[in-house]
UniProtKB/Swiss-Prot annotation:
Span list, region Disordered: 1-20, 153-230
Protein name: Respiratory supercomplex factor 1, mitochondrial
Gene: RCF1
Membrane topology: Multi-pass membrane protein
Ranges where the HIG1 domain occurs: 12-103
Organism: Fusarium vanettenii (strain ATCC MYA-4622 / CBS 123669 / FGSC 9596 / NRRL 45880 / 77-13-4) (Fusarium solani subsp. pisi)
Length: 230
């Protein structure tokens, strides 16, 4: 019906849900519990056994009347035991159904606990894998950054070397000439050529004017000093 209360999912709560002793019951504890719940059954079993023993003793003595009485008592005690069992089964039928239901619930709880443990274990492994992947990604990014920095530094060094090749070569020649490893014959040949050119210019002057020898020597000295500076 639409106006009725909403249905509760799952089984109804039981009064035995909080009874952990009932769940974790040992076999001997179960036997004693059954004896306490149905005391007439063990009583009928005891009476049947006693009647059988007395009938056996009467037969050993040769007392047939006593033996017959004990056999009748055994049959009566056995019938009493059967009636007690039937009455107990009828009386404790609901409790047995509840115990069966509780066993099923316990099995379901155990299965659910196993499933939850399995899920937690999978989640823990997933977290470990994610953390490992994050560490690997971080290391990869660091390596890429280092490689990029090294490439930038190499490119900058190559650019500086391309911009100043002449300065580096001139500096090397100046250092070699200072320490005496640069060849000095080239300088002497250049000085001779300059002197010869000056002599030819002074000799072949068409104006016929004579230059002052001191001035020509001064010019020659300035040229030689400029060559040395270069």
């Amino acid at each position: 019906m639409a106006d009725g209360p909403p249905s509760i999912p799952g089984p109804l709560p039981s009064s035995f849900d909080s009874d952990q002793d009932f769940y974790n019951e040992r076999p001997m504890q179960k036997v004693f519990r059954k004896i306490k719940e149905e005391p007439l059954i063990p009583l009928g079993i005891g009476l049947t056994s006693l009647a059988f023993v007395n009938a056996y003793r009467a037969l050993r003595r040769g007392d047939s009347k006593q033996a017959n009485r004990m056999f009748r008592a055994r049959v009566a005690a056995q019938g009493f035991t059967v009636i007690a069992m039937l009455a107990g089964s009828m009386y404790y039928q609901k409790d047995r159904e509840k115990s069966k239901e509780l066993r099923q619930l316990q099995e379901q709880r155990d299965a659910e606990e196993k499933r939850l443990k399995w899920i937690r274990e999978l989640e823990a492994r997933d977290d470990e894998e994610k953390a490992m992947k994050a560490r690997l990604e971080q290391r990869r990014q660091l390596v890429q950054a280092q490689r990029a920095e090294e490439a930038e530094a190499a490119a900058a060094a190559a650019a500086t070397t391309e911009e100043k090749p002449e300065a580096t070569s001139g500096g090397a020649g100046g250092i070699l000439s200072r320490i005496g490893l640069w060849p000095q014959g080239e300088k002497k040949e250049e000085e001779k050529k300059v002197a010869e050119e000056l002599v030819e210019e002074t000799a072949g002057d068409k104006s016929g004017k004579k230059k002052n020898p001191k001035s020509s020597l001064g010019d020659l000295g300035e040229i030689i000093s400029s060559q040395k500076k270069d």
